[in-house]
């Protein structure tokens, strides 16, 4: 069975069920005190940090060193581990790492040039197709091509098509 304990708003002591004094301020803020001494000091506006027996004072003056001695866990530092990436072996990565910047720049420029040429080629092909389509459309318009069976647009006639 687990008991739901509360903390005294003045002294910081544990308050077990059925114990304590509950004070509800005008702004609906709830204060729970362990005994009338804490309640009295709170209403007299005494500072719990100045009273030696409160949890706040003990914490400020490092009195509960035995209680606070919780081990700080150090994170294990991860050792660098070299492994290959999908699509590239360790040898390829090492070779790229050791090659000179000039060689790397030259390879990058060559790749960019190749990409630009490919883009230009596709653009030229699209332009040629557009021109071809436009010339075909002009030839077909020149002949006076009229669709067969097309009715002239005009006002619609009819009564709405409802039940009679």
Curated annotation (Swiss-Prot):
CDD domains, alphabetized: Ribosomal_L24e_L24
Pfam family, one: Ribosomal_L24e
SUPFAM superfamilies: Glucocorticoid receptor-like (DNA-binding domain)
Naturally occurring in which organism (per UniProt): Cicer arietinum
Gene encoding the protein: RPL24
Compartment(s): Cytoplasm
Designated name of the protein: Large ribosomal subunit protein eL24
Region Disordered, annotated ranges: 63-82, 117-164
SMART domains: TRASH
Family: Belongs to the eukaryotic ribosomal protein eL24 family.
């Amino acid at each position: 069975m687990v008991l739901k304990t509360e903390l005294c708003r003045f002294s910081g002591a544990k308050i077990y069920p059925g114990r304590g004094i509950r004070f509800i301020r005008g702004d609906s803020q709830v204060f729970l005190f362990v005994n009338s001494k804490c309640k009295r000091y709170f209403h007299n506006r005494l500072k719990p940090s100045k009273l030696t027996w409160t949890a706040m004072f003990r914490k400020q003056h490092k009195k509960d060193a035995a209680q606070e001695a919780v081990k700080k866990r150090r994170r294990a530092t991860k050792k660098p581990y070299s492994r290959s990436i999908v699509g590239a072996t360790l040898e390829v990565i090492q070779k790229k790492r050791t090659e000179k910047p000039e060689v790397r720049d030259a390879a990058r420029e060559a790749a960019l040039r190749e990409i630009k040429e490919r883009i230009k080629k596709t653009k030229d092909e699209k332009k040629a197709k557009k021109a071809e389509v436009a010339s075909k459309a002009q030839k077909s318009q020149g002949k006076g091509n009229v669709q067969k069976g097309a009715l002239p647009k005009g006002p619609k006639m009819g009564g709405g098509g409802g039940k009679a």
